């Protein structure tokens, strides 16, 4: 193997919008800002819900609902 070809790892902080701060090793070398993390993501917190924006499900069922019925 060749010597000195791998990037240097540095410990950085990844900060989430919920305020959670995570220390990780990375080659980026600068702090990261996350939108969601394991502490606030709906899948991991169990608060998962379906959001119907603008009645899209009703609009779909109105257009194609009759096709599924026999």
UniProtKB/Swiss-Prot annotation:
Family: Belongs to the bacterial ribosomal protein bL31 family. Type A subfamily.
Keywords: Metal-binding, Ribonucleoprotein, Ribosomal protein, RNA-binding, rRNA-binding, Zinc
UniProt: Zn(2+) binding residues: 16, 18, 37, 40
Note describing how the cofactor binds: Binds 1 zinc ion per subunit.
Organism: Shewanella sediminis (strain HAW-EB3)
Cofactor field: Zn(2+)
Cellular component GO terms held in the UniProt record: ribonucleoprotein complex; ribosome
Assembly mode: Part of the 50S ribosomal subunit.
GO terms of biological process kind: translation
Protein's name according to its UniProt entry: Large ribosomal subunit protein bL31
SUPFAM superfamilies: L28p-like (SSF143800)
InterPro entries documented for this protein: Ribosomal_bL28/bL31-like_sf (IPR034704), Ribosomal_bL31 (IPR002150), Ribosomal_bL31_A (IPR027491), Ribosomal_bL31_sf (IPR042105)
